[in-house]
From Swiss-Prot:
Transmembrane segments: 35-52, 81-103
InterPro entries named in the record: AIM11
Protein name: Altered inheritance of mitochondria protein 11
Membrane topology: Multi-pass membrane protein
UniProtKB keywords: Membrane, Transmembrane, Transmembrane helix
Compartments where located: Membrane
Record's GO cellular component terms: membrane; mitochondrion
Phylogenetic placement of the source organism: Eukaryota, Fungi, Dikarya, Ascomycota, Saccharomycotina
Similarity remark: Belongs to the AIM11 family.
Length: 166
């Protein structure tokens, strides 16, 4: 039983996209990454509109014969500060999530473990680790390593008695 390709697959194949030959699991993974980014972008747009509206509603526009050099007496600085902190936090969180999800979508990362692997490979981690393993070890490091291996093997210094104590 062969599944007939969808209209989307036909379009991808027609324009020679690599995604046309990708597995369904890979497509779902990329779709999830895209939806996370688009969702955070939508939240960013919503919070920026909310911040804009709250700024415009607090704007002081004096009437014709009022001076514009003094703010009105019925002004609550505490609530204004609370709204400013709240909208600033919302904007910072939504923009940060958009940047994080966008970066993860670009470098094809879905969780923290994959992020660690990707960063290690991008920074040459495996090659540098092999180079460090080939270097000779100094005396202090060798002594420390042997001591730790003895402790892990269950060999302790107080188990061995010296000839002077006998």
């Amino acid at each position: 039983m062969s599944a007939e390709p969808s209209q989307f697959n036909k379009l991808l194949t027609k324009y020679d996209f690599k995604l046309a030959s990708a597995s369904e699991e890979y497509r779902n993974r990329r779709k999830r990454q895209m939806m996370l980014f688009m969702g955070s972008a939508a939240i960013t747009i919503f919070t920026s509109r909310l911040a804009y509206k709250s700024t415009i509603t607090r704007q002081y526009v004096p009437s014709l014969f009022q001076g514009n050099h003094a703010p009105p007496l019925s002004y609550n600085f505490t609530s204004d500060a609370a709204v400013a902190v709240g909208t600033g936090t919302l904007l910072c969180g939504s923009v940060s999530s958009m940047v994080i999800f966008g970066t993860c979508w670009i470098i094809d990362v879905s969780n923290f473990q994959e992020f660690g692997w990707k960063m290690k490979s991008l920074m040459g981690g495996y090659e540098k680790q092999k180079e460090l393993a080939k270097l000779p070890m100094d005396e202090e490091s060798a002594f420390l390593q042997d001591s730790l291996n003895d402790i892990l093997d269950g060999k302790y210094d107080f188990d061995e008695t010296t000839p002077a104590e006998k």
